[in-house]
Curated annotation (Swiss-Prot):
GO terms for molecular function: acetyl-CoA carboxylase activity; ATP binding; carboxyl- or carbamoyltransferase activity. This is Acetyl-coenzyme A carboxylase carboxyl transferase subunit alpha. It comes from Ralstonia nicotianae (strain ATCC BAA-1114 / GMI1000). It is found in: Cytoplasm. Its EC number is 2.1.3.15. Residues 39-293 form the CoA carboxyltransferase C-terminal domain. Acetyl-CoA carboxylase is a heterohexamer composed of biotin carboxyl carrier protein (AccB), biotin carboxylase (AccC) and two subunits each of ACCase subunit alpha (AccA) and ACCase subunit beta (AccD).
Amino acid sequence: MKTTFLEFEQPIAELEAKIEELRFVQDDSAVDISEEISRLAAKSQQLTKDLYATLSPWQVAQIARHPQRPYTLDYVREIFTDFHELHGDRTFADDLSIVGGLARFNGQPCMVIGHQKGRDTKERALRNFGMSKPEGYRKAKRLMELADKFGLPIFTFVDTPGAFPGIEAEERGQSEAIGHNLFVMAGLKVPLIATIIGEGGSGGALAIAVGDSVIMLQFATYAVISPEGCASILWKTAEKAPEAAEALGLTAHRLKALGLIDKIVNEPLGGAHRDPKAMATMLKRALAESLRQFQGMKTSELQARRHERLMAYGKFKETGSN
């Protein structure tokens, strides 16, 4: 698949276009221009390194939303075996913005749950752009409870702009569904490893992310609101999104410094979409390390750690009154 370049990557896009042009000429020419192609390829790689070494939070947010970025089912195919998808919340409907099912991780039975976006217009609409409704979160809760019943570790993958804000979602109890998930996750007797693979949007992300270990990919984001939404509230214009992204502290390194996530998994040069297989290999290693850390831990300790993490989200400091 041809790489789609973001706006800030245009200098790289121009170099890559030139390289492709020269390769096309090379195929039909007796003149050897391989040395020039190699020179431009090295220049493109160095430019990518330089650009990605100084990314702003707003640029990171754009990478997290990249249309070619691996989604949950891509990681399921690369990391797990024997995946069998389970459907429906047994109450209302089957929300396709959340996928989940039984699988094996390094031969061990487990439960996998995650947000799923679409690759084309039809699939994006079918999966509601990764914005889950109450029935999606209730499906996730059902699968978590099933895993808990059979003693299976749970792996969740977060990639959502946020919970769906439509009227019908509110009518069916969106906030109750999210809140109930937090309650259930806090009390699970099995390890839960959560990974932010793209966008981690507010309560819609947290609803499947109260884990014993929270992993975040290098160019993923995690925040209480999107930069555009924040800018629209504070400055009354979405054009201030870059400033909002800076203020939100949504990048992996910022969140790790704040103690809100546990581990950062580096991405291939140019982002996970440049080499999905390499990304999956690195993530699988991190998941295995996290699972080893918590497997065999006493239930009471798992629950206490999770409750402590949940209570640590959002703090305030008394400054005195006038």
